[in-house]
Amino acid sequence: MINLTDARIVRGIHSNINATFNTPQGKETMEFLQEACGWYESILDTENEFKTIINAGRREVIATIMTFLNHSPEQIVAMAKQKGEGNG
């Protein structure tokens, strides 16, 4: 797992994600990913708990990308430290 408490690593990822998704093509790709990963749908599948877990994982990918798009590297590092995600 990537160490999101390391500011140097986070700055690099932040730069790459923003370079990718803050373009017209990147925004179109994000819209596609949101639709494909069920971003706007409930993750709960009352008939299949494994499907709920899969749905949550798909949405986690989008949430992570959006976190990098909507927050500064410093904010991301602070959030990771708060969650204790430094030893991945």
Report the location of each language-model feature:
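Intrinsic-disorder/low-complexity detector
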Residues: 1-88
